[in-house]
Amino acid sequence: MNPNQKIIAIGSASLGILILNVILHVVSIIVTVLVLNNNGTGLYCNGTIIREYNETVRVERITQWYNTNTIEYIERPSNEYYMNNTEPLCEAQGFAPFSKDNGIRIGSRGHVFVIREPFVSCSPLECRTFFLTQGSLLNDKHSNGTVKDRSPYRTFMSVKVGQSPNVYQARFEAVAWSATACHDGKKWMTVGVTGPDAQAVAVVHYGGVPVDIINSWAGDILRTQESSCTCIKGDCYWVMTDGPANRQAKYRIFKAKDGRIIGQTDINFNGGHIEECSCYPNEGKVECVCRDNWTGTNRPILVISPDLSYTVGYLCAGIPTDTPRGEDSQFTGSCTSPLGNQGYGVKGFGFRQGNDVWAGRTISRTSRLGFEIIKIRNGWTQNSKDQIRKQVIVDNLNWSGYSGSFTLPVELTKKGCLVPCFWVEMIRGKPEETTIWTSSSSIVMCGVDHKIASWSWHDGAILPFDIDKM
């Protein structure tokens, strides 16, 4: 064939292929329409895809029509039910590591907040670490002087448990230098205290929105738990203190529903002192182990009923668990009175196990060094010295700090009981070390059915930082 004939042949073949392709597409469309109509779905294929990004679940409804995707973002569905939380505590034979954030180690070269008072609380879907920032980052000039407890720069924030308190994953909760938080099964409730010492205000947030307030009633540093509050059947309970740290103060129990205060009662505790309670649900009541910052080296015990009636006293055990404290052998124990004549103190916790008690304490008697949890037979109800188990969490060569309690809800564990858990803060920097800042990291442990070996899960950051050498 001559060149013109070749061109005509190729063009004819191409035209034929094009016509065939068009016919096939038309047939495909007709068949698709007929099939979809027969199945009662019309022209659209609808599907829902759930993707998780960090701690936020994003729901996308994707509508597909031929080769076109339409993506519609819809609001995350909220939980429909309040958590029950009336189950008993599970029996714990030991405590296994749940998480460790290593915030100070990471913060030497990462964008990590300067914090104190970290604690953990759980919803039916997740556990989160809450903390009070100083409005500054580690290894930065604004970290200077962050040993101070109360300032206008302090904010209450949270991350998913195990994450460092970093800039990129932290969620703002409240402006606060004292706080508590808990989940009722539907939404998070947070209480953040801020303002001047004589006129501080606690702002109650529910689902991220401020819905109620508590003004200082004694005019002397209104403050709260620095650990998880407790929700039972949709009602949430927490304890607040207003008044001196070294003599008689005023104490109140608060009850809220959907973030709105529906009840409160004063705690009559003449001669005793209550601060920074560590509370948990147990058999339909709220049990709290608190701090006596006035005289006692034994810890106050507060048990709250749903109607806001309460019993208050001291942990009966014949072993002291506050710091500073005297020798175990010289301590007799009391269920009703403070003993030990040691001022100051540190936030701590305990768990009732029948008549027994698991109680945490620093290993050092005089400073916040080391941490152990001990089980005392009949220690909840008697002046018992019968220590039947001990597990070291931080050895006596490393700094500890505050500690507190929380529970894993049955929605998370699928058990018939509430798993007892605790966290230990590990404070670094001022006043014990040569730095310009004070911050902390934490280790979190949860109760299990087996004995767990002692070890030291200490902070491990190498100090001083670069900013401390300038």
UniProtKB/Swiss-Prot annotation:
This is Neuraminidase. Coiled coil: none annotated. It is an enzyme of class 3 (hydrolase). The active site is at 149 (proton donor/acceptor), 402 (nucleophile). Glycans are attached at residues 39, 46, 54, 84, 144, 293, 398. Inhibited by the neuraminidase inhibitors zanamivir (Relenza) and oseltamivir (Tamiflu). These drugs interfere with the release of progeny virus from infected cells and are effective against all influenza strains. Resistance to neuraminidase inhibitors is quite rare. Residues 1-14 are intravirion. Residues 89-470 are annotated as: Head of neuraminidase. Its EC number is 3.2.1.18. Disulfide bonds join 90-417, 122-127, 182-229, 231-236, 277-290, 279-288, 316-335, 421-446. Residues 36-470 are virion surface. Substrate binds at residues 116, 150, 275-276, 291, 368. Its cofactor is Ca(2+). It is found in: Virion membrane; Host apical cell membrane. One of its GO terms (biological process) is viral budding from plasma membrane. It comes from Influenza A virus (strain A/Equine/New Market/1979 H3N8). Residues 32-86 are annotated as: Hypervariable stalk region.
